[in-house]
Each structure stands twice: as structure tokens, then as C-alpha cells.
Design a protein with these regions (language model features):
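A conserved active-site cap/scaffold subdomain adjacent to cofactor or substrate pockets
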Residues: 73-98
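Zn-dependent metallopeptidase/amidohydrolase metal-coordination segment
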Residues: 149-217, 221-222
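Metal-dependent peptidase/peptidase-like ectodomains
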Residues: 6-14, 23, 32-35, 92-145
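Histidine/acidic-residue-rich, glycine-tolerant segments that coordinate divalent metal ions
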Residues: 1-77, 156-159
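Active-site-adjacent substrate-binding region
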Residues: 44-51, 119, 123-177
Length: 222
């Protein structure tokens, strides 16, 4: 079992950038406003924001996972869409980069005579573990043979359970299960990854044991 005090996983902001240009035939580029060109410059500028405006001591990563534009090889399209995520473990860094991202996108689009719309698709805060509750759960798990929790560094992954953690104290733990084939090197979420699900019995037992004993010891709060 693994756990981290304080921030365990990063926040994530998913965004969608729609670039509007002016489409035309590829033979007449001087008559158009190329949204693909604008999108390329925006993509590069966003990477530079992280490299030059985020504190190197903070965990921060910005990923563009989609870049969609056009329908034919010889046509400059009317629009282009970039979609991506910003992940960080620092609230101040997050707010600053989101503001700067919007500013940079609009300025670049204006430079190349286009316009841009930025939509925040979803937001998940950092996952914060409550130390007191975590230590209590660790004590319960020691009673079923799991001695102590191994610490892990803050992860760039995110977890929407963090939304609940903003309302009530929570703890969050990771159960390592290994692979069915020890030679496997497929990462999490890969379609070919196969975990050793036999280990899930241990996780289920810990979950039930902790829940029962917490309820027994906190009857006045239920």
C-alpha cells in the first residue's frame, strides 16, 4: 500500500481551444487566414509557458492531446481545434498559467489575423489526504498484516475523488498488483496491460476492515 501526506495527486484543467481563420484553396494562401498555422504557434507558446513561467520546483505539465483541422490536402480550413490538459500541484502556479494561457492564445491569434475561443471543459482540484485519517487507516491495516504505508512522491496523475476531498477529510491509497506476465512493460491505461487481479482480494479486505472499524470507533459521528 502506498500513500502520500498532503497533496498526493495534481489538479487538472482540461481545455479546448477553437481557432477561427478564413478558408480557401491551397493555391491561394495569401487570401486566407490559416488556423493551422495559428494552432502550431499556440502549441509551441504553451510549452514555453511551462518552461519559462512555472516555478521549476513545482510539478507542472501541459499536454496538447488533440489537434484537429481540415478535411482535404489542398484546402486551408476555416478552423482548427486544440484540446489538452494542464496539471500542477501549486494553486498559484495553476491560476497564473491559466490566465497567461488565455492571454497568449488571444495575442497569437490576433498576430496572424485570426480569432480564438477558449473553453474550460473540466476542472479537478489537487487530491489532498487528511493526515489524521490516513494514520488511523494505517493502524487498522496493520491489524490485518499490512505494516505501514510506503510513501510516494507527488504524482502528475489526477483523481476526481479530489472533489469529494474538498468537502470532507479523506485518505487515498494505492494498491500495487503487478502483472500477469512479469515481462510485461505496458503502462497503465494501455489496452494490452494485464494486472494480477488476485491481489485485489487484499485491497477489498483492507477496505472492508477499515470501514467496519472506523464505523465502530466513530458511532457518534454516524
Amino acid at each position: 500500500m502506498y500513500n502520500a501526506e498532503g497533496i498526493m495527486m495534481n489538479s487538472v484543467d482540461e481545455f479546448k481551444i477553437t481557432i477561427h481563420g478564413k478558408g480557401t484553396h491551397g493555391a491561394y494562401p495569401h487570401q486566407e487566414i490559416d488556423p493551422i498555422n495559428i494552432g502550431v504557434h499556440i502549441h509551441l507558446a504553451l510549452q514555453e509557458l511551462v518552461a519559462r513561467e512555472a516555478n521549476p520546483q513545482d510539478i507542472c505539465t501541459l499536454t496538447i492531446g488533440q489537434f484537429n483541422a481540415g478535411s482535404a490536402a489542398n484546402i486551408i480550413p476555416e478552423s482548427a481545434i486544440l484540446q489538452g490538459t494542464l496539471r500542477t500541484n501549486n494553486i498559484s502556479t495553476r491560476e497564473n498559467l491559466l490566465n497567461r494561457m488565455k492571454e497568449v492564445c488571444h495575442k497569437i491569434a490576433e498576430t496572424y489575423r485570426g480569432t480564438v475561443e477558449i473553453e474550460m471543459v473540466s476542472t479537478v482540484p489537487p487530491l489532498m489526504c487528511d493526515l489524521k485519517l490516513t494514520l488511523e487507516m494505517a493502524e487498522y491495516m496493520s491489524q490485518v498484516g499490512i505494516e505501514g504505508l510506503k510513501g510516494i512522491p507527488n504524482s502528475t496523475a489526477t483523481e476526481d475523488f479530489a472533489i469529494i476531498a474538498e468537502k470532507i477529510p479523506i485518505t487515498y491509497m494505492l494498491l500495487t498488483v503487478g502483472f500477469m506476465d512479469e515481462r510485461s512493460d505496458y503502462p497503465l491505461h494501455h489496452p494490452k496491460v494485464q494486472f494480477d487481479e488476485n491481489v485485489c482480494v487484499i485491497g477489498a479486505a483492507c477496505f472492508v476492515y477499515c470501514a467496519i472499524h472506523w464505523l465502530e470507533n466513530h458511532k457518534n459521528r454516524v
